[in-house]
């Protein structure tokens, strides 16, 4: 298998692993979403550090640590990045317990479109015709949701509007993805320990002995998903990597409807159809750009 084939396989594996989280979270009763978030942070650290060693990223991690010592502004920005991604982690752990995975998937469907607008507003990137049409379709879906419910789910808005500032900050930091992720998880550790010690249910391991292996498994699942995601990002052209990233919200939506029993009615369809069309248009546009770039390299 060539590098592109391995990259595609890793991207699909990453999306499938992330889509397993909602079902996995439901097995962690009696823990609530915040406790599951805290436990995920704690158990992710040994798994991520092991992944760093096995992937040969130890030297890169040390160089990033030295850079933090030399650049105080970077050291100040890293806790902000950790806070931004921590909110997303907490939401991802809480949503399955509240039965709002469909709303979360909509946020991830909207995210690429918000990123297109972010590039236009903050980086002066021009919208190509298909991108502009995609944004218009997405706005049509949003307008229908507002007309239907007179509101918009905050669960949808948090990933759609919360990730762009995080990505912008990470772009400014120019830090290796493995290093940045490792530092972010380590910075979340004090909060996680405080949440577990202060609010964790007493004798939870006695009441639910399966947590002895399910919680470490949560950390392993997080590390494997992240490792596959980062591996695919290094092996694939950015355009193809972006197109394949749309698989995750599709799988989340399917899991919510087919396995978690969340309802999806005809009225909601008219919110999702324009947004799905927008995602297809963005995918076509990215595919065209990828094809043009590949022809230039021939």
Please provide the spans of the model-predicted regions.
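Hydrophobic/aromatic residues within transmembrane alpha-helices
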Residues: 28, 36, 95-96, 121-123, ...
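Membrane-interface interhelical linkers
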Residues: 1-13, 46-80, 129, 181, ...
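C-terminal-most transmembrane helix of multi-pass membrane proteins
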Residues: 41, 149-152, 246, 250-298
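Glycine-/small-residue-enriched transmembrane alpha-helix faces in small-molecule transporters
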Residues: 1-38, 140-172, 294-298
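Hydrophobic alpha-helical transmembrane segments of multi-pass membrane transport proteins
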Residues: 12-20, 24, 79-96, 158-169, ...
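Hydrophobic transmembrane alpha-helices of multi-pass small-molecule transport proteins
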Residues: 127-146, 159, 268-286
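Helix-helix packing/entry segments at the starts of transmembrane helices
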Residues: 9, 105-110, 177-187, 223-258
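C-terminal transmembrane-helix exit sites in multi-pass transporters
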Residues: 94, 110-130, 250-269
């Amino acid at each position: 298998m060539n590098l592109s084939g391995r990259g595609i396989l890793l991207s699909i594996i990453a999306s499938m692993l992330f889509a397993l989280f909602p079902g996995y979270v439901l097995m962690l009763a009696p823990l609530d979403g915040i406790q599951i978030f805290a436990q995920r942070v704690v158990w992710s650290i040994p798994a991520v550090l092991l992944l760093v060693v096995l992937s040969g990223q130890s030297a890169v991690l040390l160089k990033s640590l030295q850079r933090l010592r030399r650049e105080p502004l970077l050291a100040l920005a890293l806790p902000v990045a950790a806070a931004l991604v921590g909110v997303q982690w907490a939401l991802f752990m809480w949503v399955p317990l509240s039965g709002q995975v469909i709303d979360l998937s909509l946020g991830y469907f909207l995210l690429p479109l918000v990123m297109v607008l972010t590039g236009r507003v903050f980086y002066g990137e021009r919208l190509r015709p298909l991108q502009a049409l995609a944004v218009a379709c997405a706005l049509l879906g949003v307008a229908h949701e507002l007309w239907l419910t007179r509101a918009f789910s905050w669960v949808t808005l948090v990933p759609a509007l919360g990730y762009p500032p995080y990505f912008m900050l990470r772009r400014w930091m120019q830090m290796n993805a493995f290093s940045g992720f490792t530092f972010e998880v380590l910075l979340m550790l004090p909060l996680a320990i405080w949440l577990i010690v202060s609010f964790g249910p007493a004798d939870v391991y006695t009441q639910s002995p399966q947590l002895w292996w399910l919680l470490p498994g949560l950390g392993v699942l997080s590390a494997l998903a992240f490792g596959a995601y980062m591996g695919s990002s290094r092996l694939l052209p950015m355009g193809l990597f972006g197109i394949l990233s749309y698989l995750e919200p599709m799988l989340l939506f399917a899991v919510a409807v087919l396995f978690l029993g969340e309802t999806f009615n005809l009225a909601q369809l008219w919110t999702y159809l324009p947004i799905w069309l927008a995602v297809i248009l963005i995918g076509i546009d990215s595919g065209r750009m990828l094809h043009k770039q590949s022809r230039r390299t021939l």
